[in-house]
Amino acid sequence: MKTVIVYASVHHGNTKKLVEKIAEECKVDLIDAVQQPKADLSDYDRIGFSSGIYFSKFHQTILKFASENLPENKKVFMICTYGGSGAYKSLEVILKEKKTYIIGKFGCKGYDTFGLFKLVGGIAKGHPDEKDLKAAVSFVAGLQ
């Protein structure tokens, strides 16, 4: 199956670190939605979306990319990094509109100095770590 992960990694590189490890270990293509806001995804069997979580939402670049580029009736999975907790609803709304099949969700801690976390020097330092990277690779490798 041909797989792509569309990602946005804009602060500490947490998401980029994760998806690059996945691409290294699994046969997937990567699209940086910040650098390439338009892409034809019709040839892909599985499409992943990945970003950090900002105030309980996927990054706006990912939400816009999914709204504008995602074909209907595709198998889709989500990967997020977060300081607080994972949140998928913002993207799930778009995926539902596109009549997709959600085949999985994965999230892990990521170093976060966004907003108020900056005042305390950040949270989840050192993440994603090796354990997180291995778990992400296992998640993608196990997708049907």
Task: Please identify what each model-predicted range represents.
Residues T3-V6, V10, K16-K17, E24-D29, ...:
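FMN-binding flavodoxin-like domain, especially the glycine-rich phosphate-binding loop
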Residues K27-K38:
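A short beta-strand-loop structural module common to alpha/beta enzyme folds
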